[in-house]
Structure formats: structure tokens, C-alpha cells
Amino acid sequence: MEAFSDSFRTDLSQLMRWRRDVRRFRSDPVDEALLMQCLDTFRLAPSVGLSEPWRIVRVKSPELRQKSIENYQTANATALDGYDGEKAAMYSGLKLSGMSEAPEHIAIFCDDSTTKGSDLGATTMPEMRRYSVVGAINLMWLHARSHGLGMGWVSILDAPKLCTDLDI
């Protein structure tokens, strides 16, 4: 396997350093062709047994976007209740989501029950499907960042409720 140039490695290293969780988004629409390029990076991602367990949902309707935001707000309030004193003050001061400002909402799920790949590599380590999804998200994130797009990772959610709200 041939090595990449020093210049490429420097640029890649810089891209990885600048891949950060964004909480403050521009509100102008994301170019549709560019968004599709970002989503297409999932096709390049490795996955256990070629299972491609990721399931991607664009949350476009204002009603579903609002439900997602409210889901976050409820889960965030519950999380805040778990802190006292200084930790509660610090937590409440964090900007943990930019969902209201973000021009796109994309929900990404792992299909743990996929039959694609015939369980190759997942029989003994089923968590590899989830690792595959995380790896694919990282590729999308790097691609988006290389085009000047920011992404944010929202994990403060009631996932079962989100699945119900999105009819997953």
C-alpha cells in the first residue's frame, strides 16, 4: 500500500483537529447536492460483515423537528436534575444543542437486527454493528467539515420516544 504525501497527511491531521461538535449553526439552507455527498460517505464506511447497519432519517417537517427539540429539552431537564450546586450551575450554562438553529436534522440509528452480512463478525461481538455506525458518522463528519459544514452530536434524548415520534 502506497503512503500519502506529507502535505495530504498534514491536511488530514488539520481536518481531524477541526472536526468539532458544533452548537452554533448558520441558519441558511445546506446545499442539497452537498448534503447528499455527505450522506453518500456512509457507502464508503467499513461495517462489520458488510452489514451496513446504519439507518438514516432526515427530519424535515417542522412538526417532527419540534418534537425532536422538545425531546431534547425534556431529557436535558432530567439530566440537569441529577446535578446539584456548582455542577448544576455549570451544566445549565452549557450549550448542549443547536437543534433550534440547525438547518438540517438527521437522525442516525443502528439496526441491530439487520440480516445483511449474515451476522459475519457480529455473532460473537454484536456491538460491532454500533461501532460500524459510529465509524460511518465520523466519515460523514469529516466530509462535512472539509466543506465548511458543522455537525453536532445530540445524545441527550429519549431514544425510544424519538423512534416513536419519527415512526421508526
What residues fall within each predicted segment?
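Glycine-rich phosphate/pyrophosphate-binding beta-alpha loops
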Residues: 43-49
